[in-house]
Amino acid sequence: VRAALCAADERKVAVIVKGTGKHTLDLLDFAVEHCLYAPETFDHVWLVYDKDDFPASDFDAMERKCNELSDGSRTFHALWSNPCFELWPLLHFRYTTAHMSASDCQHALAQEMSRDLGIEYRKNLDGLFEVVDGKRGEALQRVGRLVTYHRGLGNVKPSAQNPATKVGEIFDVIGPYLAG
């Protein structure tokens, strides 16, 4: 995503990616501390994380805590995926409501990328954003369908929504800055 961003309206856009390996609430604590001591200020802080094997209570609390910490000067965004981040690129290829494990999701993404693009998927694949971004509109529509699907089932907690992701919400803010 960082490579695809461009300056617009002479506003500064800085993307700082910090892979911490931390789980939900520790990730939020890390982000808050980083914001306190960083020389630059941040209007938006996106926390991207998976359900993984973390306790449902922590996974579900993250969104609420992000909202509590957000104020008029800075917004913390909980961009969770259940079961894993790979659901976001998978939704660029197809819609699914099938409950899945992280390995199921990664396998499905690998199949779609191989079949549709002739690309072998592997975790942390460089250039993944550029490969799938042409279908972002379709992915966002599929995310919307998943929201409606889970709402219809009464699944309000993130931990109960499998599959589901909020990763696409980042484009509400950065979309205007993307080249092309």
Region roles according to the model:
Residues 2-17, 25, 31-46, 51-180:
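C-terminal accessory helical subdomains adjacent to catalytic cores in phosphodiester-
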